[in-house]
Amino acid sequence: ATAQLLRLAGPDDRVGVVAFDEDVQLVLPLSRHDPDTAANEVLALRSGGSTNMSGGWLKALELLAGGRRPEALRRVILLTDGHANVGITEPDEMVAFVRGAQAQGVTTSCIGFADGYDEHLLAALADAGMGNDYWCDGPDQATRVFADEFGGLASVVAQNVSVEVRSSARVAAAAVLNEFPVTEVPGGFQVAMGDAYGGERRKLVGPV
């Protein structure tokens, strides 16, 4: 599945690949790669017995932090068919790391394979990372999932959009009913809405 993802990358895209089981392995550094050569590197991998999900994600974050293109979209795409059972395994702790990275401009999308992965954890990580959450049943579906993910990246028109809401003196209290992260600021609050895509409409909903 990862080999298919690599073939969807454009000529200007830089992609890195990290593999994780009980250990974490850098397969491809963050760079432009020949799709066939990169795919062969990925296809040579063999699965292990455990899932160090946090270690893999943190290594990917390290790759992105070393990038030298500040204007680039930075996204971790986490693929797994298992449960986090090595490294950081507490869901709230993992979510906090992903949310912190999102505040620094790194989004996280998650793709779970088959029926053995932790769907609740991946959904929480994708929400915290302002990314997408997918379920993938096999190679045929993987092509569509990856096309959706890369198509979304290509249509990003603004990153890390936030809206600041300030109420008038006549308003006793204000709130947001959406599940966007909210931060209090003097005189109101700031709503983090993630990346904005061309042609997309976003709504903020509050009580009346």
Enumerate the language-model features and the residues they cover.
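Exposed acidic/Ser/Thr-rich ligand/metal-binding surfaces
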Residues: 1-162
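An acidic, Ser/Thr-enriched
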Residues: 160-208
